[in-house]
Amino acid sequence: MAQGTVKWFNAEKGFGFISTENGQDVFAHFSAIQTSGFKTLEEGQKVAFDVEEGQRGPQAVNITKLA
């Protein structure tokens, strides 16, 4: 499982990007966030996730927020 920092996330549109520890930007969709209730991420938040190859490049799945 990779770790990274939320680069930006638009809650209205339901997506954003996570910067990995090696500097790669990975697409993040709200449906991949593993939490109950309103699924959103905050800029600068630390997260753990798996990476899958999506239709337009690397995509984060199984996103969990780190304390």
UniProtKB/Swiss-Prot annotation:
- Major site of localization recorded for this protein: cytoplasm
> Which key words tag this protein in UniProt?
Activator, Cytoplasm, DNA-binding, Stress response, Transcription, Transcription regulation
In terms of InterPro entries, this protein maps to:
Cold_shock_CspA, Cold_shock_domain, CSD, CSD_CS, CSP_DNA-bd, NA-bd_OB-fold
Matches recorded under PROSITE patterns: CSD_1 (PS00352), CSD_2 (PS51857)
* Domain of life (superkingdom): Bacteria
Q: Under what conditions is it induced?
A: In response to low temperature.
Question: Looking at the keywords, is Cytoplasm present?
Answer: yes
Name the GO cellular-component terms.
cytoplasm
Instruction: Show the CDD domains listed in the entry.
Output: CSP_CDS
Q: Where in the cell is it found?
A: Cytoplasm
State how it assembles.
Homodimer.
Looking up PANTHER family in the UniProt record yields: COLD SHOCK DOMAIN CONTAINING PROTEINS
- The protein depicted here goes by the name Major cold shock protein
Q: What is the lineage of its organism?
A: Bacteria, Bacillati, Bacillota, Bacilli, Lactobacillales
